[in-house]
Design a protein with these regions (language model features):
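Periplasmic-binding protein-like
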Residues: 93-94, 146-153, 212-215, 272-282, ...
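Beta-hairpin "wing" of winged helix-turn-helix
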Residues: 31, 36, 64-72, 76-79
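Flexible loop/hinge segments that line or gate small-molecule binding clefts
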Residues: 152-198, 218, 284, 310-322
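Amphipathic helical "hinge" segments at domain boundaries
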Residues: 17-21, 29, 82-147, 218, ...
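Flexible loop/turn connectors
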Residues: 22, 262-369
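Extreme N-terminal segment that seeds HTH/winged-HTH DNA-binding domains in transcriptional regulators
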Residues: 1-48, 56-59, 86, 109
Length: 369
């Protein structure tokens, strides 16, 4: 095995801490319960360290509950009830991709309030919408000291193996709003399919047949994005309208993002069957679409109608007639906290749960909600 040298510069973590971190990352990313790890002498050779240093690193991983030592047999990945019981701390992690803005802040307040009522403390982690920062925060969760975590993941799948590792090793997790595609786990969020379906159906009922969907298709992908796309598509199908992939458009890389929306909207309006409505993934796309329509001399809603998901019913766009799908952040935070507590205390339902909150439709053209 290739020797992996440790950093020995001033200010670097102690050698055992570096080994501990490397092994922790490898366990979470690719090991299963019962897998045997390499003997200490092999690890010492690999890291260029003495066996006492390796033994100390492994000892800490045993304390974290990731490993279990079996006399005469070796050291194995724990799981499935093996290893020492996790000490209860009545402390819960709250991992968010960002903490500013109405949507995350209301979920945070609601979750913290519900947890506090049950005498749980919270530790807030802000990944700043970075998959690397999120990976660091997930590693901190694995180090122990927490009973569980509420997680709103970054809208990219890079850390799915780390999430799976935490679940595999028994840390209670509940995902907020979304989770990586293909990952099994508890989720509490908006009913994204229904919100997209209802909004698109309203546009169709007003006579629109060429409806674009401005969304992420490749770079960012998670359950909420996928469910909104499926809701949009199903509404078209149920109303006898063929789904046109050309009308589903992801943002592209331009020096000025608004140029993308302008050029895309101009392209979709170019022929004798122009797009007459747009359903947007979220309110930032709505803002860009309104700017693009203005730049092209299009009036809303006379020339083109715009709909999309919003974080709250009151918005700077209130002077523009936009159909809004409003998410219930307070309910999401409260329900997620309740589900996490039930998992921690052992009284939760069998199997992973997906709890959805029905969004509110605010339609200025019909005067209805």
């Amino acid at each position: 095995m290739t020797c992996m040298g440790l950093v020995r510069e001033p200010g670097a973590p102690a050698p055992y801490q570096q080994i501990q971190r490397i092994l922790r990352e490898e366990i979470l990313a690719g090991k299963s319960a019962g897998d045997r790890i390499a003997p200490e002498r092999e690890l010492a050779k690999r890291f260029g360290a003495n066996r006492a240093t390796v033994s100390r690193a492994i000892g800490w991983l045993v304390k974290e509950g990731l490993l279990i030592r079996r006399v005469g047999r070796g050291t194995f990945v724990s799981g499935g009830g093996e290893g020492p019981a996790r000490a209860r701390t009545s402390t819960v992690g709250l991992v968010m991709p960002y903490i500013s803005g109405v949507f995350p802040s209301r979920i945070i307040r609601s979750a913290v309030r519900s947890l506090k009522e049950r005498r749980y403390k919270t530790v807030l982690f802000d990944s700043e919408d970075s998959v690397m920062a999120e990976a660091d925060e997930l590693e901190r969760l694995a180090q122990g000291g927490l009973d569980g975590a509420l997680i709103m993941p970054v809208e990219k799948p890079d850390n799915i193996s780390l999430f799976a590792g935490l679940l595999r090793f028994g840390l209670p997790l509940v995902f907020l709003d979304r989770k990586p595609l293909g990952l099994e786990g508890d989720l509490v969020g908006s009913d994204n399919f229904r919100g997209a379906y209802d909004a698109t159906s309203r546009l169709i009922e007003r006579g629109h047949r060429r409806i674009a969907h401005f969304t992420w298709l490749v770079e960012r992908t998670c359950t909420s994005i996928e469910q909104r796309r499926r809701g949009y598509e199903q509404a078209l199908i149920d109303h006898g309208i063929e789904v046109d992939p050309e009308l589903m458009c992801p943002p592209a890389s331009f020096p000025d993002e608004s140029l993308y929306f302008k050029y895309t909207l101009a392209y979709l309006r170019r022929d004798d069957r122009p797009v007459t409505a747009v359903f947007c993934l979220h309110d930032q796309f709505v803002l860009r679409t309104i700017d693009a329509a203005s730049a092209l001399g299009l009036r809303i809603p006379d020339d083109i109608e715009v709909a999309g998901y919003f974080d709250e019913s009151f918005h700077p766009l209130d002077d523009v007639a936009v159909l809004k799908v409003i998410q219930g952040q307070d309910q999401i935070g409260e329900l997620a906290a309740g589900l996490l507590i039930s998992r921690i205390e052992g009284g939760g339902p069998d199997g992973y749960q997906e709890i959805t909150v029905v969004p509110e439709i605010v339609d200025p053209l019909s005067g209805s909600r």
